[in-house]
Amino acid sequence: TEIQVRVYPKSATFKRAIGYRMTPDAPLQMTKETGFHPRTSELTRSFGEYRGYWVPHRFTAAGPVEEYWACREKVVVMDLSPLRKLEIMGPDAESFLQSVFPRDIRKLAAGQIFYTALCYEHGGMIDDGTLFRLCQNNFRWIGGDDASLLWLREQAAKSGAQVLLKSATNDIHNVAVQGPKSR
């Protein structure tokens, strides 16, 4: 067989990548950097793959013990961009969500957010996360697992509700600011 040789200039950079699939039959996606990577890469070279994204494992200036105590006693910033985000829109959005979440969605006013579980009909938990009501017929679910997005899409198709479910994970990158001094 022929051997193909490519020559690259010294200035060429090559990014690490791992293939990720939402489901076994889903198209392969390569790991991505979050929107915060340019800044976090100045603070560490220790990144790990999490749900298709490279996120910091630890920062060079502090060790894991110091980071733990900062979270318990001070403040930390965590890149949570890999959390799964799903926009749920349409005239039946509220009634659809009312049928799939165990909380009373009708009590959630525009601009409010609450923590909830997402459960199967028999009560088994699929995922937990937050549901944000952006306006009357527009919501955003933020959960940790691809299974919740897939299950919500299945339920929307079964229900016949007039809702549009749009993945926003790649469009919205977020950090969590946590700890007792986070306010």
Model-derived regions: residue spans:
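Basic, glycine/lysine-rich polyanion-binding surfaces/domains
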Residues: E2-R183
